[in-house]
Amino acid sequence: MASLKVPSNVPLPEDDAEQLHKAFSGWGTNEKLIISILAHRNAAQRSLIRSVYAATYNEDLLKALDKELSSDFERAVMLWTLDPPERDAYLAKESTKMFTKNNWVLVEIACTRPALELIKVKQAYQARYKKSIEEDVAQHTSGDLRKLLLPLVSTFRYEGDDVNMMLARSEAKILHEKVSEKSYSDDDFIRILTTRSKAQLGATLNHYNNEYGNAINKNLKEESDDNDYMKLLRAVITCLTYPEKHFEKVLRLSINKMGTDEWGLTRVVTTRTEVDMERIKEEYQRRNSIPLDRAIAKDTSGDYEDMLVALLGHGDA
C-alpha cells in the first residue's frame, strides 16, 4: 500500500547525516543528493538521521534544510522530514488559519489517522503551540462547522472489526430520516459520524445504500454545490469509508489546467506515501486515465518534481 522505496541495505544514520552535511557544503546545494537520501528513508530512519545530525553538527536538520532550500521543493522536503505526528500538527495549525470550502486538512487528519496516532498528533500540537487543537478549532470556527469539527478532532474511535448489525440498521434509518428532513447538523446525525468505528459506520452506510437505494453521499451532493458545510460533511464520510477516493480528488483538483495547487499536492504526497499511496495511485489512474506520476511530471518541474516522483516509488532507492 505504501509507495516508499527503501534500499535493501540502508546506510547507517551517521553516514546519511554526513552525506546530507556535504550536500549543504561548498558552492551551492546538492539537491539530488538530498532527494536520494531523504526520499528513500522511512519515518523511523529519518528520525534517526535528524538525531544524529543534531548531535554531530550541533544544528537541527530542519533548520539546515530551511537555509539551503526554497519554494515548493523546500516545503516538500521539510514536510516529509518531519515525524508524522509533528507534520500533522503543523498541517492542522495551518489549516485553522485558513478555513475555506476546500480546506479538508483537519478532516483528513481526524478521519484517516488511527486513534492512537491521532493522540500523538494532539500531543505534538500542544507541545508546539501551547494549546490544544480543540481550542483552535473552537476559536476559528462557528455554527455547523464547529459542531462537526470539534467532535471529530476530539473522538477516540474503536478500531476493531466488530459490527452490530441491528445498530447498523437502526442508525441507517436515523441517517435517512435526517437526510430526508435536511437536518444535516442534527445531534444524532453528527454523533453517528463522529463516534462510530469505521467498521460499524461502513455497515451502517452499506445498509443505507441497500435499503434506501442511494449512497448517502449521493443524497448529500444534491445539496452541496455552494454549501461549505455540506462539502465538509461529504469529505468526512469519504475519508472514513474510502480515503483513497478523497485523496484522489484532492490530487485531481490540485493538478488541473487552471494551475497547480502545490499545497494540496505536497500535502497528499508527503502524508500518504508511507500509508496508502499505491491505492491512491490506482484510484487516480482509474479516474483520470493517466498515471499519477505522469500527471505530476506534466504539472511540476525541477527538484520539486523529482522529490514528489521519488516518493511515489519511482527511481532507484
Curated annotation (Swiss-Prot):
Subcellular location per UniProt equals: Cytoplasm, Cytosol; Membrane
Q: What superkingdom does the record give?
A: Eukaryota
Q: Which PROSITE patterns match?
A: ANNEXIN_1, ANNEXIN_2
UniProt: Ca(2+) 1 binding residues: 24, 26, 28, 68
UniProtKB keywords: Acetylation, Annexin, Calcium, Calcium/phospholipid-binding, Cytoplasm, Membrane, Metal-binding, Phosphoprotein, Repeat
Q: Name one GO cellular component term.
A: plastid
Tissue-level expression? Expressed mainly in roots and flowers. Low in stems and bearly detectable in leaves.
GO molecular-function terms, A-Z: calcium ion binding; calcium-dependent phospholipid binding
InterPro entries (alphabetical): Annexin, Annexin_repeat, Annexin_repeat_CS, Annexin_sf, AnnexinD_plant
List the transmembrane segments: none
Has UniProt tagged this entry with the keyword Metal-binding? yes
Binding residues for Ca(2+) 3, per the UniProt record?
300, 305
Phosphothreonine modification sites are 100, 112
Per the record, the GO terms for biological process are:
phloem sucrose unloading; polysaccharide transport; primary root development; response to cold; response to heat; response to salt stress; response to water deprivation
Q: Which residues carry this modification: Phosphotyrosine?
A: 129, 284
Instruction: Spell out the family assignment given in the record's similarity comment.
Output: Belongs to the annexin (TC 1.A.31.1) family.
Q: What does this protein do?
A: May mediate regulated, targeted secretion of Golgi-derived vesicles during seedling development.
Q: What is the name of the protein in this document?
A: Annexin D2
Supply the gene name: ANN2
